[in-house]
């Protein structure tokens, strides 16, 4: 058995199946476990999915505007710190990566609602 097969087998055990399916353009709320000292709490990060990556270690990028400043956060899909993901809204987009939203402000950054 080669090294890559061993790695694939280990990552297959850690794969999460409880998360909903979502696509770039969807507005999601990601509940993340935050550990402060000996306490643990949940923190929500709500924004638009601007990209997903697949492969052995899939991840997705969520962008939001906080106090007029753009904030992006990259989440590993199979991470244990993600408690749950809620899909709030779906948008109709024609791109897999929505990096062009970084340059847009205000109403120009809106996405069309999916039917």
Swiss-Prot record:
GO biological process: translation
Swiss-Prot/TrEMBL keywords: Ribonucleoprotein, Ribosomal protein
SUPFAM superfamilies in the cross-refs: Translation proteins SH3-like domain
Domain of life: Bacteria
A GO CC annotation given for this chain: cytosolic large ribosomal subunit
InterPro entries linked to this entry: Ribosomal_bL19, Ribosomal_bL19_CS, Ribosomal_bL19_sf, Translation_prot_SH3-like_sf
Xref: Pfam families: Ribosomal_L19 (PF01245)
Molecular function terms, GO-annotated: structural constituent of ribosome
Keyword Ribosomal protein (UniProt): yes
Family, similarity comment: Belongs to the bacterial ribosomal protein bL19 family.
Role noted for this protein: This protein is located at the 30S-50S ribosomal subunit interface and may play a role in the structure and function of the aminoacyl-tRNA binding site.
Family matches, as PANTHER family: LARGE RIBOSOMAL SUBUNIT PROTEIN BL19M, RIBOSOMAL PROTEIN L19
The name this protein goes by in its record: Large ribosomal subunit protein bL19
Species annotation: Koribacter versatilis (strain Ellin345)
Gene that produces this protein: rplS
């Amino acid at each position: 058995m080669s090294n890559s097969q061993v790695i694939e087998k280990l990552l297959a055990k850690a794969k999460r199946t409880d998360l909903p399916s979502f696509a770039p353009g969807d507005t999601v709320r990601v509940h993340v476990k935050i550990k402060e000292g000996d306490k643990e709490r949940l923190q929500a990060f709500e924004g638009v999915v601007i990209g997903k990556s697949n492969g052995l270690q899939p991840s997705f990028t969520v962008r939001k505007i906080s106090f007029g400043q753009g904030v992006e956060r990259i989440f590993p899909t199979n991470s244990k710190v993600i408690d749950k993901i809620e899909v709030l809204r779906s948008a109709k987009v024609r791109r897999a990566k929505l990096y062009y939203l970084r340059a847009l402000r205000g109403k120009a950054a809106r996405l069309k609602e999916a039917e």
